[in-house]
Structure formats: structure tokens, C-alpha cells
């Protein structure tokens, strides 16, 4: 397959080869990224990319869908088995579109929604004014406690009582602690609101039984299929059976046309992997590595939002190093460590600058990194940030990164 691409389009082939080289040679710590299996990539690069299949299994608007119907049913059934969901839609192209479909199912323009503040750990689609969610709906924000940096559930309840939202959104893109979904449902019930949980970052941990499952508590659960779930980039929706027809209509014909059947096939393969015993071991290793990395960073004198982590994600406050998140991201990338700048609770800097960096352990754990490697990564991060203007020190860091990544070859068949 690669040989065909190389002969047909040398420029695209070269860019893909360069990206493969980047992934092999750098330490990937972006919390929303992971490395899929070769089987997932094979499914996504299959002949299913040729097939249009508007509609759902058994009710398509095109002929010739008998085989893609099988694939979509496999994907849906596996998700039900993993999470205990009553109904599943695996067609969303992204987590953002999954969230949009839920909003379109139960909200009217201007309805009030309670969601987590973006700088406190929420997501753009949870009411940011630059996103469709903040434009179409009246979002009221809740956040974290100023000292503990954990969700203040009493504050959530108080705001829910005051504003009477039609929907409460739980879930986050930069919150390193366990979320109490049962408490959120109690709050939603008290004010007569629906509850939607966006579990995009923690879905793999939930699948492995290592994080509380939101499905028994939420009317709707949305997620991406990559991140800790280690599937292709995409989204899905899990919901109570009473909302099944509405959700399906919101996706098609509501906001999407034909589903990406090659991606759904890749999702199905990833869900099959998540059902294996070794996936639970993998997820436990993600958490163990995150805890070890957090401990190492703190020993090096770095400040962590909330003081640590319960999941795969760590948020570093770099202000005591007298640098910005933007500078930290750049200098770490220069030595071969990939992270992303990120706002922190009660942020004062621009989102293009930020006071923090977000890191995660899903990708390095997929690659085989263990606890001792987390010690070295913590040392490397601290050494690099503390010496960000010292070229000799940065060159030493580059060599240490190269020595570490060389121990863990990846995608050797490509």
C-alpha cells in the first residue's frame, strides 16, 4: 500500500514518512493523542472508504450496504458490551459533532445550559463564546475551587438552582481528577435538568473499569474514540433507549450525511481491543505512569494543578519558572518532548500564551514506557524548562530524549 503512495505522490508520501519519523523520535505527551494498532490503521485504510451508506444498518438510502451494516453493528454491539449502554451511535465524525447532536436533540436556541469553564478544564463545546455552543445557547459556567482546584459540587448545585438549566454538562478536557457523575445526576434531578457527560478523555479508563462509568447516571454520554480509548479519530454517543430515535435523527440527517464507514470499521477494531484483558492492564499502566510522572515533577519543584492526578492527565503551572505555557511548549518540542500549552484555573494570560502545559501518559504507555521511564521524563521536563535559554543544556536534553525513544521502537513494519 505504501509503495503505491510513494509511486503516485512523492510529496504526500514524504510528509507521511516525516510524521512517522517524528512520532518515532519524540516523546509524545499530548494528553489527547495516542498510538493506534496496525490493525486499526488497516481497517481505516480499507476499501470501506469507497462505500456510501447514508442511514443506519437495515435502513440505508443506498444499495450494497450489507457488509458495512455488519461492521457498524459490530461496533455498536461492542460499545454496548464495554459500557453497558442501552443505545449507541458510532457515526459522529468527532466528539464536537457528538456534543452538537445531543444539544440539537433536547435544546432550543437560547436555552440555558450549565457547563464547565474552559480555563478550569472544560471544553470549547461546553459553552465557549467562540464555539457554536456558546453562540446558540445560554451557557452558565461552573468551575473548580480556588485552593483545591477540584470541582465544587456545592457551587454547581447553587448555580443549577439559580439558573434552572435545561441541560447540565459534565466532563472536561483538562481536569486531572475523578468526576462524581452520581453527584451530577443528583443535582440534575433536583433542578429537573438533563445530564450529558463528555467522557472523551477518560473513556479508555472507564472501559477498563478504572474510572467511574457515567452511563448509569447520565441521560447522554458523548466521547471521542481516540485518546485513552486508543481508536481512530472520531466520536460516538451513548444514551438511554428513550432518546435513541431522536439522537439518530440528529446525526443523520440532522448534522451529517454519509458516515465514514472505514473509520467506523477502525472504531470496531479498537472496541474489540478494549474488550481484551490486556487493555485493562494497559489502562492501569496509564494511571500508574501518570502518578509516577506527577510525583517526579513535584520532586523537581514543578507545580501541578490540583496537586496531582487521578487519571492520565497532568496540568503543570509554569508561572513559578517565570515562563509561559507557550514558551514551555516550544522549548520542550525543541528537545523532542511534545506537549500543548494550556490555560489553568483562574487564568490571567491569553489562551495563545497561557500559564500552563497539559501532558498525558496514554501515548507513551502504548509505546511501552514504564515507571522508571517516567522518572527520566520528569527529570527531562524540569531540566529543559529550568534551562530553557541554555543551548548546551538543551542539546544534552535532546540526546537524553533520543536515548530514551531508541529503547522503544514503534511501527517497525511501516
UniProtKB/Swiss-Prot annotation:
Keyword Transferase attributed: yes
GO molecular function: glycine hydroxymethyltransferase activity; pyridoxal phosphate binding
Reaction(s) catalysed (UniProt annotation): (6R)-5,10-methylene-5,6,7,8-tetrahydrofolate + glycine + H2O = (6S)-5,6,7,8-tetrahydrofolate + L-serine
Keywords assigned: Amino-acid biosynthesis, Cytoplasm, One-carbon metabolism, Pyridoxal phosphate, Transferase
GO CC aspect terms: cytosol
Binding site for (6S)-5,6,7,8-tetrahydrofolate: 118, 122-124, 240, 350-352
Highest taxon of source: Bacteria
Cited SUPFAM superfamilies: PLP-dependent transferases
Function summary: Catalyzes the reversible interconversion of serine and glycine with tetrahydrofolate (THF) serving as the one-carbon carrier. This reaction serves as the major source of one-carbon groups required for the biosynthesis of purines, thymidylate, methionine, and other important biomolecules. Also exhibits THF-independent aldolase activity toward beta-hydroxyamino acids, producing glycine and aldehydes, via a retro-aldol mechanism.
Protein name: Serine hydroxymethyltransferase
Originating species: Bacillus thuringiensis (strain Al Hakam)
